[in-house]
Amino acid sequence: MNSIHIKKKSNRSFRRRKVFGNEKEFDLEELDDNDIRLRQALEATKRRKIRNSIIGINAEKLLNQETKKEKQLNTANEPHEANDQTSAQSSKLIEAQLPTVEDRFAKQTNEVDINTHLLNFVEKKLKQERLAQNYSENGETNALNTKNESTVQNIKNSLHPNEHSFIRDAAALGAIREVDLGIISTDVDNLKNGRKRQKKRARMKEKLDSKALRTSEDAARDEFIEKMLKPISQDEESKGIYRRFRVYKDGTQD
């Protein structure tokens, strides 16, 4: 099996401090304080730290930092050196600085006053509401005290829209909306019982319709049967008047 090799970390205090990002590597201790390369190296390390830091804006750091204008004023108040090289170095440093929060947003032009703009907007809305109220009360365009005819027409259209401009609701036309009955509507047993009841009602209706009205012949037949089924008295039996079937002289019977 391969053995695991753990590399020991060397003491960082004895390591050579190098700044990467430029074309050449150099030791910071060998440079002079006024050297442009030292300042550029410090700016490069500063940019790298900010780039590798957590995404977002830290309010405390921004408050502690100076703005670009303040830095320019501070550099202007410092004593100028006679050499042109130092002035060029300072200008390059100012240009190389990171933009602050104020520089990231567009500056105000002060061309539009926000307060007056909002007041005009509110007054316009109130005027339209007053016009609509006057129109609803009077019902005539002559009663409107306005100069803008387009706004009057818009208000009129909003109060009395065209009938063809919208779709009528089904409930307004008297249609019954679909109602979800839940589990009852999807239960198989309830559906079967409902079908059975419908079939039974249909059969009962057919039976009632099939029964014809009673005629005179039906009434005479029923009367004859009632007479035949009456109990026979002794007198009638002795006389032979009442029989189950009446026999005539010619031999026929009914």
Swiss-Prot record:
- Residue ranges of the region described as Disordered: 69-90, 195-216
Q: What does this protein do?
A: Plays a role in pre-mRNA splicing by facilitating excision of introns featuring long spacing between the branchpoint and 3'-splice site. Assists the splicing of several components involved in chromatin organization, such as several shelterin complex subunits.
Q: Which InterPro entries does the entry link to?
A: Tls1-like
Q: Which PANTHER family match?
A: SPLICING FACTOR C9ORF78, TELOMERE LENGTH AND SILENCING PROTEIN 1 TLS1 FAMILY MEMBER
Phenotype of null mutants: Leads to abnormal splicing of introns featuring long spacing between the branchpoint and 3'-splice site. Decreases protein level of genes involved in chromatin organization. Sensitive to cold; simultaneous knockout of cay1 or sde2 leads to a growth defect at both higher and lower temperature.
- GO biological process entries: alternative mRNA splicing, via spliceosome; mRNA cis splicing, via spliceosome; mRNA splicing, via spliceosome
Q: Where is the composition biased (Basic residues)?
A: 195-204
Q: Which domain of life is it from?
A: Eukaryota
Keyword field: Cytoplasm, mRNA processing, mRNA splicing, Nucleus, Spliceosome
Check the record and name the Pfam families matching this protein. Answer: Hep_59
Subcellular localization, per the record? Cytoplasm; Nucleus
GO CC annotations, alphabetized: cytosol; nucleus; spliceosomal complex
Q: Where is the composition biased (Basic and acidic residues)?
A: 69-83, 205-216
Q: What is this protein called?
A: Splicing factor tls1
Q: Which family does it belong to?
A: Belongs to the TLS1 family.
Subunit annotation: Component of the spliceosome. Interacts with brr2.
